[in-house]
C-alpha cells in the first residue's frame, strides 16, 4: 500500500465537508457581507480599462458589461447561501457570467488580473471607507473636546500625579492635553489612509502582466490616489493593515487613559466631575447610588477596541513576506469588529464630554485641604525673598505638613506655620504679609502666573484654542477633498461603464 501514488489513488472531491463549513462558508459570508460593492467596482473598472487599452474589443466588453448589470439586477447577495458548488464569491460571479454569456466571453474579464490583486484591492476599498467613517467620528469628538475646553478655560480643577493631588489647573487646560493627543492620533489615521490609498490592481498574481494594462487608469476609476508601484508589494505587503490597526490601537490606548481619569474624578472621594442624570444609572438595592456607568462602558469598549486592533497586529507577526491567507478574508473581517466598537466609543465619549461639568465646591474643598498651591509659595519666595529654590521648597514643605497635620486649609491656616518656617530657616522676618500670602496660595493666582507657552493662563490658552480649531478645519477640508474625489471617480466609473453597454 505504501508504494501506491496518492495522486493517482485520490478519489476525493472538493470541497471537503468540514473544510467547507469551517473555512469556505465563513469566507463566502464575509465577502457577501463586506465586499459586494468592492467586487462590483473592481469588475467594472477593470473592464473599462481592458476596453480603453484595446485588450478587449467593444462587442466583448459590451456583452460582459450587460451580464454584470443583469447579475446586479437578479441576484440579491444578502440572500445567497454557500453551497460549495464554487470555491468563493469571486467564482460565483464568474459562474453567473458564464451562464449568461458563455465561457469564452465571460472568461475574458479575468484577463491580466488575479484573485491576489483583487483581494488586496477589496480590502483596501473596505478599509478606506471604514477609516473615513471612523475619522469623521474622531473629528466630532475633537470638536466636542475643543468646545468643552473653551467653555472651561477658567474652570479650576485638581490635577493629579501618581494618583495624588498635585497642582491646580483648569479643566480647559487638562482637556487641551487630550485634544493634542487626539490630533496626533487623527494624523496617524491620515498617514495610514495614505498607505491604504494605493491600488494593487494590475499586479495580477505577483509580477503584473504581459498585456498592455493601464494600472493608473484602474486606480483612478476606483478612487485611489495612485497605483502602488512595486507589484510584489501589492500582494505581499501588509503595512496597509498594520498601519491602520496600529493607528486604532494607539488612539484607543490614549482615549482609555482619559476615560480612566473621568472614572476616578467621578468617584465619591474626588467628585470633581458631575455627570448629569441622563447619563447616570441607579442601584437596584442601594437608594443613594448614582452610578456613571457610561464611563465604565467607555473604558471596556476602548479596551476591547485596543485588543481587537492588537490582535490584527499579532496575526501579521512572523508571517511570510508573500501573498498568504493570514492577512486576508477572515482576518480582515475580524478587524472590522475593532472599527465597530471604536465608533461606539467615539460617539459616546463625544456625548459625555459635552454634558459633564465640574463641581466648583468640591474642587475648592479639595484644593484647600490638599495644599496643592504650595508650589507657587516656593516660587514666590524665590522671586520676592531672593531665596534659592531649594530653601524655598523646604519652607513650603514645612508649611504644607503643618496644615495637613492641623486638618486645615492652606489659605486660612497656613500663614502662621509659614512665619515660623521662614524665620527658622533664614533667621529673619518675611516681607510677605497675610493678605499677600493668601493671594500667593490662591488657585486663581497659581493659574494666572503660569502664562508661558503651553500653560493654563488665559493668553496661552487662547492661542492654543486657535491652533486646535485650525487643525480641525484642516482635517475637515482634507476629508471633504477625499469625499469629492471619491464621488467624482465613482461617477466617472459609472459613466464609462454605462457607455460600454452602448456597443451591444
Curated annotation (Swiss-Prot):
Pfam families: ASL_C2, Lyase_1. Pathway: Amino-acid biosynthesis; L-arginine biosynthesis; L-arginine from L-ornithine and carbamoyl phosphate: step 3/3. One of its GO terms (cellular component) is cytosol. The keyword Acetylation does not apply. The keyword rRNA-binding does not apply. Keywords: Amino-acid biosynthesis, Arginine biosynthesis, Cytoplasm, Lyase. GO terms for biological process: arginine biosynthetic process via ornithine; L-arginine biosynthetic process. Gene3D superfamilies: Fumarase/aspartase (C-terminal domain), Fumarase/aspartase (Central domain), Fumarase/aspartase (N-terminal domain). It is found in: Cytoplasm. It catalyses: 2-(N(omega)-L-arginino)succinate = fumarate + L-arginine. It is an enzyme of class 4 (lyase). GO terms for molecular function: argininosuccinate lyase activity. Its EC number is 4.3.2.1. Disulfide bonds: none annotated. Belongs to the lyase 1 family. Argininosuccinate lyase subfamily. This is Argininosuccinate lyase 2. It comes from Agrobacterium fabrum (strain C58 / ATCC 33970) (Agrobacterium tumefaciens (strain C58)). The lineage of its organism: Bacteria, Pseudomonadati, Pseudomonadota, Alphaproteobacteria, Hyphomicrobiales.
Amino acid at each position: 500500500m505504501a508504494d501506491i501514488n496518492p495522486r493517482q489513488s485520490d478519489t476525493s472531491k472538493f470541497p471537503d465537508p468540514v473544510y467547507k463549513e469551517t473555512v469556505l462558508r465563513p469566507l463566502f459570508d464575509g465577502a457577501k457581507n463586506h465586499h459586494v460593492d468592492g467586487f462590483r467596482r473592481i469588475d467594472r473598472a477593470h473592464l473599462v480599462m481592458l476596453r480603453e487599452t484595446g485588450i478587449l474589443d467593444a462587442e466583448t466588453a459590451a456583452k460582459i458589461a450587460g451580464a454584470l448589470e443583469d447579475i446586479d439586477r437578479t441576484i440579491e447577495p444578502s440572500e445567497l447561501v454557500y453551497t460549495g458548488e464554487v470555491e468563493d464569491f469571486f467564482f460565483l460571479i464568474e459562474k453567473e457570467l458564464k451562464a449568461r454569456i458563455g465561457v469564452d466571453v465571460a472568461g475574458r474579464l479575468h484577463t491580466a488580473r488575479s484573485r491576489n490583486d483583487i483581494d488586496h484591492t477589496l480590502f483596501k476599498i473596505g478599509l478606506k471607507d471604514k477609516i473615513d467613517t471612523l475619522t469623521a467620528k474622531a473629528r466630532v469628538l475633537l470638536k466636542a473636546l475643543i468646545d468643552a475646553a473653551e467653555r472651561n478655560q477658567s474652570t479650576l480643577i485638581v490635577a493629579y500625579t501618581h494618583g495624588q493631588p498635585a497642582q491646580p489647573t483648569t479643566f480647559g487646560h487638562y482637556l487641551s492635553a487630550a485634544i493634542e493627543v487626539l490630533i496626533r492620533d487623527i494624523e496617524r489615521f491620515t498617514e495610514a489612509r495614505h498607505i491604504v490609498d494605493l491600488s494593487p490592481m494590475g499586479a495580477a498574481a505577483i509580477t503584473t502582466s504581459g498585456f498592455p494594462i493601464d494600472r493608473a487608469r484602474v486606480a483612478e476609476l476606483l478612487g485611489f490616489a495612485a497605483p502602488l508601484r512595486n507589484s510584489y508589494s501589492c500582494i505581499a505587503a501588509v503595512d496597509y493593515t498594520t498601519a491602520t490597526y496600529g493607528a486604532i490601537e494607539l488612539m484607543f490606548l490614549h482615549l482609555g487613559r482619559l476615560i480612566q481619569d473621568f472614572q476616578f474624578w467621578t468617584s465619591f472621594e474626588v467628585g470633581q466631575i458631575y455627570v448629569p442624570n441622563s447619563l447616570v444609572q441607579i442601584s437596584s438595592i442601594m437608594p443613594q447610588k448614582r452610578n456613571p456607568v457610561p464611563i465604565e462602558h467607555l473604558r471596556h469598549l476602548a479596551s476591547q477596541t485596543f485588543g481587537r486592533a492588537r490582535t490584527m497586529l499579532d496575526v501579521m507577526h512572523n508571517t511570510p513576506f508573500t501573498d498568504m491567507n493570514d492577512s486576508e478574508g477572515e482576518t480582515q473581517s475580524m478587524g472590522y469588529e475593532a472599527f465597530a466598537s471604536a465608533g461606539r466609543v467615539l460617539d459616546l465619549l463625544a456625548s459625555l464630554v459635552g454634558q459633564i461639568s465640574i463641581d466648583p465646591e468640591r474642587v475648592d474643598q479639595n484644593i484647600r485641604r490638599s495644599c496643592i498651591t504650595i508650589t507657587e509659595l516656593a516660587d514666590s519666595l524665590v522671586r520676592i525673598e531672593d531665596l534659592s529654590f531649594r530653601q524655598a521648597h523646604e519652607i513650603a514643605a514645612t508649611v504644607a505638613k503643618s496644615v495637613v497635620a492641623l486638618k486645615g486649609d492652606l489659605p486660612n491656616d497656613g500663614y502662621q506655620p509659614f512665619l515660623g518656617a521662614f524665620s527658622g530657616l533664614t533667621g529673619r522676618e518675611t516681607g510677605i504679609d497675610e493678605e499677600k500670602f493668601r493671594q500667593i496660595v490662591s488657585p486663581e493666582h497659581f493659574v494666572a502666573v503660569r502664562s508661558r507657552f503651553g500653560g493654563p493662563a488665559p493668553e496661552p490658552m487662547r492661542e492654543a484654542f486657535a491652533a486646535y480649531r485650525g487643525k480641525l478645519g484642516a482635517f475637515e477640508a482634507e476629508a471633504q477633498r477625499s469625499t469629492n474625489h471619491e464621488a467624482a471617480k465613482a461617477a466617472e466609473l459609472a459613466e464609462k461603464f454605462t457607455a460600454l453597454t452602448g456597443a451591444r
